[in-house]
Amino acid sequence: MPVVSLADLLESGVHFGHQTRRWNPRMDQYIYTARNGVHIIDLVQTAQLMEDAYEYVRSSTINGKKFLFVGTKRQAAGIISQEAQRCGAHYVNQRWLGGMLTNWETIRKRVDRLKELEALEASGGIDRRGKKEGSMLRRELGKLQKYLGGIKNMRKLPDVVVIVDQRREHNAIHECQKLGIPIIAMLDTNCDPDVVDVPIPANDDAIRSIKLIVGKLADAIYEGRHGQPDVSDDYEEFDEGLDGDNLEVEAAEEVEEAAEAEVAATPEA
């Protein structure tokens, strides 16, 4: 039985690319045709590459590899969180903070701070700090949970990174390349297949397309751990009216600045 059928791919709109004027010529090998000024992705290739990706993910999981899912656009954020948690992977679904991988030791200090504040809250310690200090601590806790909650249990760099929207997540791509971490990515017709290791040509803008592809990759991880994929199908859809390009940037920058401050305060060896 195939990992995904052509009918499922069609029904989920995986074949719809971008307008022809917005294409990346390097994606030509994965484009079937153009209709009404829109490129159509070759689903026969997508189905085969999904087979390859599924087996790669499943076998990597069996061999103890750890995965990080990355998708910060509004259409992907809820799916990334739900599917990563379902299969036991780590995830980033808000903003990619600079140095999240290449400056991991410093980011991990912020993760430790998150755990410290969560423990303090659970023990009632924040309530005992007074109104002003308690409010400041809760604000800090909220920001850390939002941007680092998905990697709270990640104690080392991931072995493989799964990305939705290669163009948007270019900072994550760059850090993975610098560290030699394999990249699995959904590739729309405006993407560059040369920067990923395991390509999956697919519409990376439609919720149903993202849900199908990311869900199958999560199934592969689940199967690698438990022998059979989980078949649960519920997920939270993000409001299509939200501006996913700039979700609480100021709060994210404060988390990032705190990490950078730790670097500056660390004496050179």
Swiss-Prot record:
The record's annotation in InterPro entries points to: Ribosomal_uS2, Ribosomal_uS2_bac/mit/plastid, Ribosomal_uS2_CS, Ribosomal_uS2_flav_dom_sf
What is stated as this protein's family in its record?
Answer: Belongs to the universal ribosomal protein uS2 family.
Report the record's Gene Ontology biological process terms: translation
Q: Which PROSITE patterns match?
A: RIBOSOMAL_S2_1, RIBOSOMAL_S2_2
**Pfam families of this UniProt entry?**
Ribosomal_S2
In the UniProt record, what gene is named as encoding this protein?
rpsB
Listed under GO cellular component are: cytosolic small ribosomal subunit
A GO molecular function term, named singly, is: structural constituent of ribosome
CDD domains in the cross-refs: RPS2
Keyword Coiled coil applies:
no
Q: What is this protein called?
A: Small ribosomal subunit protein uS2
Q: Which UniProt keywords apply?
A: Ribonucleoprotein, Ribosomal protein
